[in-house]
Amino acid sequence: MSTAPPDPATDFQQRLSAVEGRLRDLARRRLEGRTEPDPGTGERWDAGQVWAHLGEFIPYWIAQAERVLAAASASPVPFGRTKANPERIEAIERDRNRGTTALWHDVREDLNDLRAFLASVSDRAWRVRGLHPTLGVMPISQIVDRFLIGHLEEHATQLENLRPR
C-alpha cells in the first residue's frame, strides 16, 4: 500500500475529461429556461450566459494560478476576483448571444490550455499558496479545484438542468 499523497493532477485531468464530455453533449442541445438562483446573489442565468461565463473564466483562472506560481513566494500571493468584477460581468453580457457553437469552440480550446497547465504543475507547486480577496489563503490545488475543475462541473450541471428547446 502506497503512503504517497494522491496526485492532484491525475484526478484533475480525469475530472476535466469527464466534464469536457458533458459540455460537448450539452453544446449539441438547444436549451431554454434559467438556472436555479445563485445562493449569494439570487441571479438566474440563461444558457447563453452560462456558456459566455465558461468562455471567460477558464483563461482568467489559469492566468491567476500561473501568476501565483510565478511569484515563487513563501508567502501567499494575492490573486483572483469576486462575482462583482466589472470585466467578468461585461464579458458575460458581451458574449451571451454569440451562439453555443462559437462559445463551445472557444471553451474547447480553453480546456486544452487547462489540460496543458495541469500537466505543467510540479508535485511541489501544488502546495504553493495564493490569497483570494474573500476566501483567504488557498493552495494551488484548491484554486484549481474551486475556480477551474469544480467550477466547470458546477456549470455543466446548471446546463443539464435547463429544459431542451
Walk through the language-model features, giving the residues of each.
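Individual transmembrane alpha-helices with interfacial aromatic-anchor signatures
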Residues: T134-L148
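Alpha-helix boundary/capping residues
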Residues: L54-F57, A72, V121, P133, ...
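Helix-loop segments that flank and shape redox-cofactor active sites
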Residues: G21-G48, A70-P76, S120-G136
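Short, structural beta-strand-to-alpha-helix junction motif
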Residues: D46-A47, G99, P139-I140
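Long amphipathic alpha-helical segments
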Residues: R124-R127, E154-R165
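Alpha-helical transition-metal enzyme core signature, strongest for iron centers
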Residues: L16-L23, A47-A65, N85, E90-E93, ...
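Short, helix-capping/interhelical loops that line the mouth of catalytic, cofactor-
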Residues: M1-F12, Y60-V107, P164-R165
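A general structural signal for short secondary-structure boundary/capping elements
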Residues: D95-G99, A125, V137
